């Protein structure tokens, strides 16, 4: 009889309770090594757990909606030969601060002497990828006296964030806010006519914003004498990269390299992606048209931000999410005000529901749902795929340089951003979650400074997250869900924005500010906010946590009044028992 292998969730750092969004196999299925078994979902990305070896699935211990941690049994596999080793981590999981990525098992090749390298161009530092992390690394290295080459496959610097992500989405979200605020001013006696949306002008304005920023980056590169090469780069050795450019192939040699290759949109297999009515976030930001009925597949940050834009522009929105709540990375009480608002604005919000099939028809996209009410169908004019992103680590031929890339495309690094090859570093999306531009830029400066001989390493206590929805949601440090899962004793203070003079004056009092404090030390553990401009407010909480502030420190810091920023101050006063703006009965 063939041995039975227990396949368990690998090391995913300190974070627990990762959600299972799909089980991809069933008992009796034959799988090959590296076939995906289950899909897990974090804040902004999905991760698959692969089979450690070929075999036949005997039993399955998980179902969609379950929460798992390291060591949770996924399934048993009947496989020939000895039991396979545990699978390696699909990716580092998001947590209050950056999670430790698995250290490479063995060092890679050392840098070759300069005299042995034949190349068209030689640089002390090559940066592969020019997103927020890449250009920051290049500019910082140049400022520290290094000769730098920056390789980018697209014509414009800035990567996904600037060109097809953070910046264009915020431009459109701003205009969406203008539309909705004008519409909702009627309750105060100010009535505007229905807005006329000139889609071509709106698109041109958005593109103009991007143009200013990309032009600015090009200027900054020239000022620093950073050589920019436009083309697709791949490693050919531990000291060389081949770049396919419009003028031909160029070989670039380097003493040190920083990989900043980013990530790509994840897709659910089996859908007719050749149909232009199925779009991803990049397609949604092109603003080709405003569909009458739009399906958002994925109730995370990216999907809900795009839903906010298209709802304001006039689309009837349906959101479908496999889990039992929106924005899985945030606490449910923080998401609730957003959920209540969009329930009134959107056509449908389908939770615990799977998109089983999409059929391209002449009159629209016929979508089959499987959910609590059984199997249903509906017709949409467009469907936005927003189920996360995948790292680009496997697109670089990193193996030619000896760089370790795990099965999901992540490149493990240490706290100085080093890969297993000592002179090659990795930053941003490609080296682990959370996939956020501000994480990438922080890592970029660390890598550049280490290369320049500085004593730098990643020691940030938290990486804040923001959903730029309406209302916005922001959180940092430990969430309450994480604190409970880790058995941490804490005190919670929640200040409702209904008691905030500024929130009431703006007509948006549905928000709240929540702060968690360590029960013994009284230091801030985490904070979350939902409400107008929550993304602008969370930075104070980040600074407080980084500085080791406790409830007393925050409550004794004089805040301007009336502001939304004082809601964190009020939450700290609630924790201290000194608040006068609310009556809190003594315990």
Name what the model sees in each region.
Residues 274-291, 376-451, 536, 544:
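FAD-site-proximal beta/loop scaffold in flavoenzymes
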Residues 32-50, 69-84:
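Short hydrophobic beta/alpha edge segments that flank linear recognition/processing sites
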Residues 25-26, 31-32, 51-52, 62-63, ...:
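Surface-exposed strand-loop junctions at beta-sheet edges and helix termini
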Residues 129-133, 155, 297-300, 330, ...:
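Glycine-rich Rossmann-fold phosphate-binding loop(s) that bind the pyrophosphate
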Residues 137, 142-154, 160, 167, ...:
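Flexible, glycine-rich terminal cap/loop adjacent to redox cofactors
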Residues 1-39, 48, 52-54, 58-61, ...:
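Acidic, low-complexity mobile loops and tails
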Residues 92, 98-113, 117-126, 139-146, ...:
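Glycine-rich flavin
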Residues 125-150, 303-312:
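N-terminal Rossmann-like FAD-binding beta1-loop-alpha1 element of flavoenzymes
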